[in-house]
Amino acid sequence: MITLAVDCMGGDHGPSVTLPACRQFLEHHPDARLILVGGQDSLQGLVHERVTHVVASEVVTMDDAVEVALRRKKDSSMRVAIQQVKDGVAHAAISAGNTGALMAIARYLLKTLDGIDRPAIATQMPNAQGGATTVLDLGANVDCTAEHLLQFAVMGSALVSVLQDSDEPLVGLLNIGEEVIKGNDVIKKAGELLRSAAKSGDLNFHGNVEGNDIFKGTVDIVVCDGFVGNVALKASEGVASMIAGALKQEFSRNIFTKMAAIVAYPVLSAIMRRMDHRRYNGAALLGLRGLVFKSHGSADVLAFEQALIRAYDAARNNLLDRVRARVAHAAPLLAAADAQPAS
């Protein structure tokens, strides 16, 4: 039985989304249990034999500073949910709340794995191969060293080995060009470290990739700092939304375009499903001594259920142990990288 702790109060919509999503998740996963964390009255919206309620008196808002969430709101639904993982009661925690607060609280309570300096946020983006490309970091670390990018690559490889059942996922380093001479000093040094990791057998490194390679499916994993990753994520969501809106507008122009829409509906529906970012909701916070997943703050029921599914799959497939094993195997490489003088 897999047990997930859910922050039911987080995100833009709170229990109006999280509780229906949890109900749907339970219907589809008979071997799962949920620990719902939130206000006592709010939690009454879902009573189930495989649900436990844990009352929390506070809520971390999307506007709360990290200091407020971490130091003052010690009985927040977000913190109490993560505490369930620390105490060994739950296999993973899920929240749609404030990203900065979630990362800070998770790092404070769970700590990082040996050999990992900073956790990273990783999620998937749809690609032209019919699958998805895993990208990290997506906002946890806006300033990264080359050593951090190497750590992200190691952890991302473990994640994709679970998501895609691949022993040797292909890693790419996001850059402004494929040539090794391209990029700033951090990217150039990261490229050197990743090539060394490939030679030692710790990684399957493709080389530099560009932004369009994320959606081509050139590699399985794209590594970047959190600033660039977050921009890429939000830009992709914006483009997908724009295309969906444009298609709807154009097919609604007159009776002929509406008839064309009816004929084209099966194809259009399949395309929009592939591009629907809700199907890829649920970002893993990698590098912690426990599993924590971040849902998009604006997630609807379908999207939040997807985040629950990702956390469930990660726990069922022992993601934490596989990340820990990858990091331990690469420990000499990571230690050597950290020992190198700063450029």
Swiss-Prot record:
Assigned EC number: 2.3.1.274
GO CC, alphabetical: cytoplasm
InterPro entries assigned to the protein according to its UniProt record, in alphabetical order: FA_synthesis (IPR003664), Phospholipid_synth_PlsX-like (IPR012281)
Annotated metabolic or biological route of this protein: Lipid metabolism; phospholipid metabolism
Enzyme class: transferase
Catalytic activity field: a fatty acyl-[ACP] + phosphate = an acyl phosphate + holo-[ACP]
GO BP: fatty acid biosynthetic process; phospholipid biosynthetic process
MF-aspect GO terms: phosphate:acyl-[acyl carrier protein] acyltransferase activity
Entry keywords, A to Z: Cytoplasm, Lipid biosynthesis, Lipid metabolism, Phospholipid biosynthesis, Phospholipid metabolism, Transferase
Subcellular location: Cytoplasm
Family that this chain belongs to: Belongs to the PlsX family.
Quaternary context: Homodimer. Probably interacts with PlsY.
Biological role stated in the UniProt entry: Catalyzes the reversible formation of acyl-phosphate (acyl-PO(4)) from acyl-[acyl-carrier-protein] (acyl-ACP). This enzyme utilizes acyl-ACP as fatty acyl donor, but not acyl-CoA.
Protein name (database record): Phosphate acyltransferase
Phylogenetic classification of the source organism: Bacteria, Pseudomonadati, Pseudomonadota, Betaproteobacteria, Burkholderiales
Gene: plsX
